[in-house]
């Protein structure tokens, strides 16, 4: 199994944590598979990833993931972005009552992290802090595309230290 092999490889490489999740075709937490993957994870902390946002019953799903022994759930509160899902994130945190960490993520940035913290009650956040960085290439042959016409081939999204700093500062209420 590919996922299990990746778990073993990550553990062997000294990973501090693992991130994965699995649902059944009907939108339930795939308990048999997750039990197998949790066993393969050993004592390495596991974050159940945003598959959680696609599960059909987040209340039951939360309890199942807690019972599996995961350390965290990464979620946008079953909405396109975590700020939009702040209400469910708050409900999950209250229901979890310290048994698992709810990690708010998706669309989190320096402009919304403080309000998200206040509205959701979350204490941990996942964010990419990406900015568009232009290529040093000055010449472009408009007749030849290397990919989709919808993508700017001379722009890369890169996590920048400055944006990470700004986002953390905003969360802490600093300038």
Please name every model-derived segment.
Residues 53, 103, 122-159, 163:
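Active-site pocket-lining/capping segments in soluble small-molecule metabolic enzymes
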Residues 29-50, 86-109, 151-174:
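Alpha-helix-loop-beta-strand connector modules within alpha/beta enzyme cores
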Residues 9-27, 70-83, 120-141:
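Glycine-rich phosphate-binding active-site loops on the catalytic face of alpha/beta enzymes
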Residues 58, 62-64, 68-128, 155-160:
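Catalytic alpha/beta core domains of metabolic enzymes, predominantly
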Residues 1-3:
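Short, small-residue-biased leader/transition segments that mark boundaries at the very start
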Residues 22-42, 55-61, 79-93, 110-115, ...:
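Active-site-adjacent beta->alpha loops and helix N-cap segments on the catalytic face
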Residues 6:
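Residues within the DNA-recognition helix of helix-turn-helix
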Residues 19-21, 47-51, 73-76, 103-105:
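Short, conserved beta-strand edge motifs with alternating hydrophobic and charged residues
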């Amino acid at each position: 199994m590919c996922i299990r092999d990746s778990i073993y490889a990550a553990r062997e490489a000294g990973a501090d944590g693992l991130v994965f999740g699995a649902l059944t075709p009907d939108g339930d937490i795939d308990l048999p598979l997750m039990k197998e993957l949790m066993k393969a994870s050993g004592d390495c902390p596991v974050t159940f990833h945003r598959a959680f946002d696609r599960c059909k019953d987040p209340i039951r799903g939360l309890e199942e993931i807690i019972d599996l022994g995961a350390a965290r759930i990464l979620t946008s509160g079953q909405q396109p972005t975590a700020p939009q899902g702040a209400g469910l994130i708050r409900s999950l945190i209250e229901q979890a009552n310290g048994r698992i960490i709810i990690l708010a993520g998706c669309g989190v940035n320096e402009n919304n992290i403080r309000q998200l913290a206040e509205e959701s009650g979350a204490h941990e956040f996942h964010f990419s802090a990406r900015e568009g960085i232009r290529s040093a290439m000055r010449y472009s042959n408009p007749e030849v595309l290397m990919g989709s016409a919808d993508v700017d081939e001379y722009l890369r999204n890169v996590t920048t230290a400055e944006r990470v700093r700004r986002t953390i500062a905003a969360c802490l209420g600093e300038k």
